[in-house]
Amino acid sequence: MLDKVKREVFFVARLLVVLYLSTLLLISYENVNYIAVGILSVYFLINVYVYFFSKPRILQLISPFLDIILVPAFVFFSKILYSIYALGVLISVYAWRKPVLAGIILLETYGLAFFYFSGHYLLMISHFILFLALFFTSYNFEYATVVGKERKRILKLKKNYHKLLKEFSNFEREKRMFSNLRKILKLLRESKEPKDYFEGLKREFNVKRISVIPVNEVEGEEVFDYDKGTLSVFVKLDRGYAKVVYELDPPFRLRDPVLIQALVEGAKLLSLYVEGFEESAEGKQVLVVG
């Protein structure tokens, strides 16, 4: 509702500016500048289109730029002294809503005042004072103070909200980790053989395939192959080492750090079932689940 009222206020202000400048053109019809007429026509037509027909927000953002470009251009090309006062309307309408734009228009007004009154310094200074007074009297300091406080409050709420989301995310992650640990410990308690244990891991964590391979050399604690969707975990046994290979489907599950941590911890518990393997079994799959 407030945005609609604001939009209507701006449109009426621009319409009054067009009517005022059109009246000045009619008064000076004998020496009319057609560039100024073209500028005013474009300004009017675009504002009407934006107000009545534009729904995309990008079109509504055009109007302020028209105010700070086309109206000062009209004042410059028309050579009509009284047209400079139309900028006072724009300064007034922007002063408490968008003070930065009002300041830009004020500076443009100063430049045009210098253009028109460069030979009459007191008259030029009086116009400087007039438009500056118009800016300050139109600026709502109470509104600006309230908006400033609300802005700080909103930024603080936004910061606290992001902090809360981060804490909630950490809580959910820890909850998943604890749940996975419970599943692994339950499987460890209920499984008597490595095969039963890894079948339980496959079922609980939806793993496509699990292989256990005796090795002599360790390439690292974990090795990822994102193309094949495999995770290799090297486990130290009492006699030698073993490599537990998980095949995940789809492969992007390798990007889940909580799942990977659970699979790594689950693989390391192989040492509780197996002391080691025969040398003849090196490099061969001694256990395949899936």
Swiss-Prot record:
It comes from the Bacteria. GO terms for cellular component: plasma membrane. The chain crosses the membrane at residues 10-27, 32-54, 69-91, 100-117, 121-143. It comes from Aquifex aeolicus (strain VF5). It is found in: Cell membrane. This is Uncharacterized protein aq_1842. Residues 147-183 form a coiled coil. Its main location: membrane. It is a multi-pass membrane protein. Keywords: Cell membrane, Coiled coil, Membrane, Transmembrane, Transmembrane helix.
